[in-house]
């Protein structure tokens, strides 16, 4: 889009106009080319330095990572059993079959497998069914059984603040000679605390359940000790570009289309050593380092110059856009780094930003100050659900372990594959002095064609309102943190309207409808909770502290929440168990009863139909764990395992239980939103219900708004 000078002076009004907003809804991405005379000067502190992320492109494809994830975990399992290590795939009659794909297909069909099912798989892979069955039984079968018996396993969490290496199961730091260190993660476990317990140090490699099952965690490496200036990073980019052109393009110049083809070939490669660097999410706070746009506090800037003042105050200056006229972020009472305060992105050839949506499904504005093209891909919001389903279906095991995977910005899938599955994908080539706008709940991704300098912020238009509420509901089950209180934003819209401020009537009506439903729900929850606990009125205080989030679901605690008070000991909180877990010295008889009556015990009982397979599995894995050689190499391995713990031997400390589903809290109190407390019906609740605002006050606001709308 090429807005006129007049249109360009009102960004939210322009982007909300029927013509442009319909394009945003249809395509998801809109590129804005400013009027020819709009050219803000670039201002950044000469001392500006930044960290970079190291990105291995072949690690980012969702299919490749799923296969790698499975191979790593099953190979640990096989190593404990002294079995051969697997590659990613095996060949049958010249056809490549991936082990993970075979595992998933068997899981989808469900065990027990019969001849008909194997024939169906053979037809699907285009190979003999007998070859698939033989390979599955010899390599995957027992690992699949292990995963089934541990499908509800909750990983014990290590406390990074612990001074010593304590057993992750019981929390004690004692018996170092009877403590194993996992050969992958180095976490310590008492042999007696394992299930089943071990009597001898294993002769082979030993891995904890967490490393056998896998967490699905992935993140970019970052060298925290290395920072680049812009000239240093530019020189590094030039050197990398020259080498890349020589190695991968026969010294011929690269077009954007060439780079695009090569980018996706690296992403889809099974393994590539190509590593690129990206200065992403840079949020320095010193004056002159927050943004490339001129700001009132930019050092050495002549703020009396009318031309400078023009750009400092222009609504397309990304420091101004989030709170420009018409942006709904004016109704939140705080600044948010990366959302209302710009973050800087300094790209290099092939550096990438993976598929994601913006926080709270807001709109984003990205501006390129200078440099090479940034290639964008976008998925219209109408297809967001279909996209999410495709990603989950492509990597069910990763999503099971990382429910918020799509919010981690570490996963890619080729646009061509999306189109194959009926998901439209659009693109934009962003160049210097151009903006790219992403509309609400538009998944987007892309890569850089070379060195460039961009920055981005978020804002919200009236059409965003329902998307914002949906984001809160979508975040709860995956425990993604809220960035601001959506319902406080609605409250502020109604309050400003009642105070005779100029607020769109349509926006007020939609806000009122949503807010009234929310208050009605709070009233229902309050009725359930007030008889179970004491009620305290505690007026809310404006802050943007993490303390405003529910300790369970990470949703904003809102206008009422539940405080779990300490009672004789620290209380530990979980949405899946009683809201109060008291730390006491365990009684062995009581512990035995708990185990006997636990969900795990019932789950085990349900596996009786497959008892023969499980028994065989247990026998084999126990043999691998307990088989101790008497030769010198075994003594060396045993010494290696316990050496670090022997050096750290300290006086015994009080017991600290690390129970399943328990969230560790430094503070004595824990906060739960009322939505998380109410499902605990019938369970003992020790604590108090805190009202930040009386429901009567919220109802009065609703009634006043209705009267003013008449």
Q: Where do the protein language model's features map onto the residues?
A:
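Conserved N-terminal structural segment that caps and organizes enzyme catalytic cores in eukaryotes
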Residues: 1-54, 153-171, 177, 191-197, ...
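Short polybasic/polar patches that bind polyanions
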Residues: 79, 123, 419
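Eukaryotic low-complexity, charged/polar intrinsically disordered regions
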Residues: 1-105, 120, 132, 139-150, ...
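Structural motif
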Residues: 434, 439-442
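Acidic, Ser/Thr-rich intrinsically disordered and amphipathic helical segments
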Residues: 69, 73-76, 98-101, 116-120, ...
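Chromatin/DNA-recognition segments of nuclear transcriptional regulators
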Residues: 88-109, 113-158, 209, 428, ...
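Extended, structured, electrostatic nucleic-acid-contact surfaces
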Residues: 179-183
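Surface-exposed polar/charged interaction patches
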Residues: 80, 109, 146, 623, ...
């Amino acid at each position: 889009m090429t807005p006129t000078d007049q249109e360009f002076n009102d960004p939210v009004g322009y982007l909300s106009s029927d013509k442009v907003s319909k394009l945003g809804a249809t395509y998801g991405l809109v590129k804005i080319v400013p009027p020819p005379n709009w050219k803000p000067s670039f201002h950044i502190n000469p001392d500006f330095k930044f960290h970079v992320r190291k990105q291995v492109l072949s690690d980012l494809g969702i299919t490749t990572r799923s296969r790698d994830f499975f191979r790593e975990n099953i190979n640990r399992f096989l190593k404990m059993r002294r079995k051969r290590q697997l590659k990613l795939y095996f060949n049958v009659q010249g056809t490549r079959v991936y082990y993970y794909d075979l595992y998933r297909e068997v899981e989808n069909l469900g065990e027990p497998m019969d001849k008909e099912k194997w024939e169906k798989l053979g037809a699907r892979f285009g190979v003999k069914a007998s070859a698939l069955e033989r390979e599955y039984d010899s390599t995957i079968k027992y690992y699949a059984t292990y995963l089934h018996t541990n499908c509800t396993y909750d990983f014990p969490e290590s406390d990074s603040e612990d001074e010593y290496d304590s057993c992750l199961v019981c929390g004690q730091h004692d018996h170092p000679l009877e403590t194993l260190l996992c050969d992958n993660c180095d976490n310590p476990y008492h042999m007696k605390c394992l299930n089943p317990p071990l009597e001898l140090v294993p002769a082979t490699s030993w891995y904890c359940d967490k490393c056998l099952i896998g967490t699905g965690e992935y993140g970019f490496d970052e060298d925290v000790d290395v920072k680049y200036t812009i000239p240093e990073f530019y020189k590094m980019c030039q050197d990398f570009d020259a080498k890349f052109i020589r190695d991968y393009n026969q010294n011929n110049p690269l077009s954007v289309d060439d780079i695009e083809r090569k980018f996706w070939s690296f992403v889809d490669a099974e393994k590539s050593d190509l590593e690129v660097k990206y200065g992403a999410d840079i949020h320095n706070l010193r004056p002159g380092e927050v943004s490339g746009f001129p700001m009132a506090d930019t050092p050495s800037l002549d703020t009396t110059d009318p031309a400078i003042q023009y750009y400092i105050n222009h609504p397309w200056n990304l420091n101004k856009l989030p709170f420009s006229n018409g942006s709904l972020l004016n109704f939140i009472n705080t600044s948010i780094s990366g959302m209302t305060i710009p973050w800087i992105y300094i790209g290099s050839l092939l550096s990438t930003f993976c598929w994601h949506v913006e926080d709270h499904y807001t709109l984003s504005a990205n501006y390129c100050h200078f440099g090479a093209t940034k290639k964008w891909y976008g998925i219209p919001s109408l297809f967001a659900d279909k996209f999410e389903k495709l990603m989950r279906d492509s990597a069910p095991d990763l999503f099971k372990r990382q429910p918020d995977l799509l919010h981690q910005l570490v996963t890619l899938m080729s646009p061509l594959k999306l189109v194959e599955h009926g998901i439209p994908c659009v693109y934009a080539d962003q160049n210097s002095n151009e903006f790219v706008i992403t509309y609400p709940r538009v998944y987007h991704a892309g890569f850089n064609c070379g060195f460039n300098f961009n920055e981005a912020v978020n804002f919200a238009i009236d059409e965003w309102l329902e998307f914002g509420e949906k984001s809160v509901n979508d975040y709860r089950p995956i425990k993604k943190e809220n960035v601001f209180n959506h319902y406080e934003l609605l409250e502020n819209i109604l309050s400003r309207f009642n105070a005779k401020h100029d607020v769109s009537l349509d926006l007020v009506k939609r806000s009122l409808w949503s807010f009234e439903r929310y208050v009605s729900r709070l009233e229902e929850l309050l009725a359930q909770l007030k008889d179970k606990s004491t009620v305290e009125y505690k007026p809310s205080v404006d802050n943007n502290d993490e303390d405003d989030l529910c300790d369970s679901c990470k949703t904003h605690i809102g206008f009422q929440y539940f405080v779990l008070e300490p009672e004789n000991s620290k209380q530990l909180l979980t949405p899946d168990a009683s809201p109060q877990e008291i730390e006491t010295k365990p009684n062995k008889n009581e512990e035995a009863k708990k185990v006997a009556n636990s969900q795990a015990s019932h789950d085990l009982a349900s596996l009786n139909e497959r008892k023969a397979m499980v028994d065989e599995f247990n026998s084999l894995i126990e043999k691998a764990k307990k088989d101790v050689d008497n030769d010198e190499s075994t003594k060396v391995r045993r010494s290696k395992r316990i050496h670090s713990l022997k050096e750290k031997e300290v006086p015994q400390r009080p017991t600290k239980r690390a129970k399943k589903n328990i969230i560790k809290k430094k503070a004595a109190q824990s906060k739960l939103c009322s939505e998380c407390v109410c499902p605990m019906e019938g369970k003992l609740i020790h604590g108090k219900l805190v009202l930040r605002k009386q429901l009567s006050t919220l109802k009065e606001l609703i009634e006043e708004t209705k009267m003013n709308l008449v």
